[in-house]
């Protein structure tokens, strides 16, 4: 069993595994008509209904013009709708359409099925080790206090 405690060695071992896992999960989107980046944007819009384009761009760390292009493509595909605010007609928010929700569900379902199929190959002890690693891995993604 691996007992790496040095942070650099552990990072060097984990990084290529995460990249390969990400690559496999991206492949599961084939045939859905959506990229992993588009799925991520749809998820953010779904969890922040009526988010503005500028706020979404800031959230994702890209320029507003670049985000506008991404949203134009999602809108053309029928996955996102721009909705005028009832309170302030100048403000336009973004919402995921029914087709967008369906494609997100399909993406999640395909990715989860792929992972579950891989997990079934592991022994009970190996699955327990993966389960034990979930919380520490989540801590790696936690925002650092300002």
Task: Place the predicted regions along the sequence by residue.
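Charged, amphipathic alpha-helical coiled-coil/dimerization segments
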Residues: 50, 72-135
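Amphipathic alpha-helical interaction segments
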Residues: 13-16, 36, 40, 129-132, ...
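N-terminal helix-turn-helix DNA-binding core of bacterial DNA-binding proteins
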Residues: 23-66, 77-79
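Helical hydrophobic small-molecule/effector-binding pocket
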Residues: 28-31, 101-106, 139
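Short, charged, intrinsically disordered terminal tails
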Residues: 139-146
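N-terminal leader segment of winged-helix/HTH proteins
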Residues: 1-36, 141
